[in-house]
């Protein structure tokens, strides 16, 4: 670990902090990330261990300034009330969080209500990344998502109403049985919602996931790569608006 006089100068422009929350209420059929369901009894010891590690790194790196914090997962919004607030409080004790730091939490649509959104905003979380994935209910069911299209839209509007002005919406394309018309419907509605950020990712079938096992024995048609390319190009043209920034292959940001 690095606790030297030069460590402060090494990070003079600040750092970004990613915190992985590995707990989910249910695991999606495509997910190959380090996530778990049914281990709620480990949340409390996990948080204790996380706090210990945060202090260890904060002291070792000589308390650098933090520009951005990202709570990923897993499902950060699945943590019990006050958990994210506790983590942020501990971070502030050993790191210097910039006043204008962007603090993001990934969220499932069915976890978000006005009370939860307002609570996270009060705790310092000023950006949400909502896992919409699709507005086609059959696709959502195939992916093992708990929400439906109506809930996805409602979650976004609820977050906005609660005062969260910086919201990313995640989408997925290149899914088994996904038609171009379904993709058109999803992207058009998402575009009309005018979030501040949109991410869209092509499905990768990961060995060991339920979705992979369904496709391999031909229980399910595999994704069509040519169709997926058409989906990407359609969405890329749709999302190009005055002021938009297509800063990375899968990401668009918008002014405001």
Segments from the language model and where they lie:
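C-terminal scaffold of the Radical SAM
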Residues: 2-14, 35-59, 64-256
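Local cysteine-cluster metal-coordination motifs and their immediate loop/turn environment
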Residues: 22-35
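Short active-site neighborhood of thiol/selenol oxidoreductases, capturing the structured segment around
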Residues: 17-21
């Amino acid at each position: 670990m690095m606790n030297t006089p030069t460590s402060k100068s090494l990070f003079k422009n600040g750092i970004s902090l990613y915190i992985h929350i590995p707990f989910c209420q249910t695991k999606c059929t495509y997910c190959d990330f380090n996530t778990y369901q049914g281990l709620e009894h480990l949340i409390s010891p996990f948080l204790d261990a996380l706090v210990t590690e945060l202090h260890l790194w904060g002291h070792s790196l000589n308390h650098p300034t933090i520009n951005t914090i990202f709570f990923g997962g897993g499902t950060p919004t699945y943590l019990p009330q006050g958990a994210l607030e506790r983590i942020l409080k501990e971070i502030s004790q050993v790191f210097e969080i910039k006043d204008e730091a962007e603090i993001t939490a990934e969220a499932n649509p069915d976890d978000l209500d006005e009370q939860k959104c307002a609570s996270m905003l009060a705790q310092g979380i000023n950006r949400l990344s909502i896992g919409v994935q699709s507005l086609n209910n059959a696709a959502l069911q195939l992916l093992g998502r708990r929400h439906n299209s109506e809930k996805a839209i409602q979650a976004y509007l609820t977050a906005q109403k609660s005062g969260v002005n910086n919201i990313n919406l995640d989408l997925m394309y290149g899914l088994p049985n996904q038609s171009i018309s379904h993709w058109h419907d999803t992207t058009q509605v998402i575009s009309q919602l005018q979030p501040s950020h949109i991410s869209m990712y092509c499905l990768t079938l990961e060995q060991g996931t339920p979705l992979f096992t369904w496709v391999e024995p031909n229980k399910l048609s595999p994704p069509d790569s040519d169709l997926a390319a058409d989906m990407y190009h359609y969405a890329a043209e749709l999302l190009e608006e005055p002021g938009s920034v297509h800063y990375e292959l899968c990401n668009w940001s918008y002014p405001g």
